[in-house]
């Protein structure tokens, strides 16, 4: 979450993409550089139980990926930019929501409760995929943001909840097959683990974002969903 003079920005890369916070007025697709999305965070409070933890998404930073051979092998397996040699080789699609000031505190409190079980706040830069409607309606808020010198996209420095590799709920690295077997059978207070994954994949499919090589695709997520379907 990041404040400006008019409200706050909320970044999502997992369930927030298809289950947004209340009171948002605008939803903008965004590209997160330098991180890979993986279902390596266990869930005992939403998509699993303490006895049978599920799996939910977290972001793995470039620095951790290149330091651990198993992480790098997994990321290279599903990356269009393999072998990974630079933070910009890692591209993850997310969304940012704009929350007006009168609802900012309510949304902060809601997210602090929702994003528990090992998640902590971190700052990341995202490149916004704005359109003419966004620019017209959020003119003042967007004009405060710098543009990237290569892409020309507006760059937002914002806070996001991440399950780091040293938190007690982190279970990676796992193969897609290992993770899929857990997701296929896990349920929690928020519903089935499969629903979480399927809705995220569907939401991303409806957000076509293009780069030099064509449409950005999360091949890891696609492989994970296909494998889960084999075990259901």
Curated annotation (Swiss-Prot):
- The record's EC number reads 4.3.2.7
Gene Ontology process terms (BP): glutathione catabolic process
Broad class of the protein's primary localization: cytoplasm
Locate the residues binding substrate: 10-15
Tell me which GO cellular component terms the UniProt record holds. Answer: cytoplasm; nucleus
The residues responsible for catalysis, as annotated, are 115 (proton acceptor)
Question: What reaction is this protein's catalytic activity?
Answer: glutathione = L-cysteinylglycine + 5-oxo-L-proline
Q: Kindly state which keywords UniProt assigns to this record, in alphabetical order.
A: Cytoplasm, Lyase, Nucleus
Please give the annotated consequence of changing residue 115 to Q: Loss of catalytic activity against glutathione
Q: What is this protein called?
A: Glutathione-specific gamma-glutamylcyclotransferase
- Identify the gene encoding this protein: GCG1
């Amino acid at each position: 979450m990041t404040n400006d003079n008019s409200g706050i920005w909320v970044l999502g890369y997992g369930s927030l993409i298809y289950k947004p916070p209340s009171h948002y007025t605008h939803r903008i697709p965004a590209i997160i550089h330098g991180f890979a999305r993986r279902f390596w965070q266990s869930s005992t409070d939403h998509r699993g139980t303490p006895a049978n933890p599920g799996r939910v998404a977290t972001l793995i930073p470039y620095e951790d990926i290149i330091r651990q051979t198993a992480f790098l092998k997994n990321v290279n397996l599903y990356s269009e930019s393999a072998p990974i040699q630079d933070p910009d080789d890692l591209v993850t699609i997310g969304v940012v929501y704009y929350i007006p000031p009168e609802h900012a505190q309510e949304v902060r409190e809601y997210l602090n409760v929702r994003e528990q079980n090992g998640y902590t706040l971190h700052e990341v830069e995202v490149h916004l995929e704005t359109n003419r409607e966004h620019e017209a309606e959020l003119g003042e808020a967007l004009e405060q943001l710098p543009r990237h010198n290569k892409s020309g996209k507006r760059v937002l420095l914002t806070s996001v909840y991440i399950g780091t590799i040293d938190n007690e709920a982190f279970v990676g690295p796992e193969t897609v097959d290992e993770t899929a077997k857990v997701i296929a059978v896990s349920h929690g207070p928020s519903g089935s683990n499969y629903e979480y994954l399927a809705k995220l994949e569907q939401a991303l499919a409806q957000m076509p974002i293009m780069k030099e090589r064509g449409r950005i695709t999360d091949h890891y997520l696609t492989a994970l969903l296909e494998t889960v379907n084999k075990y259901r």
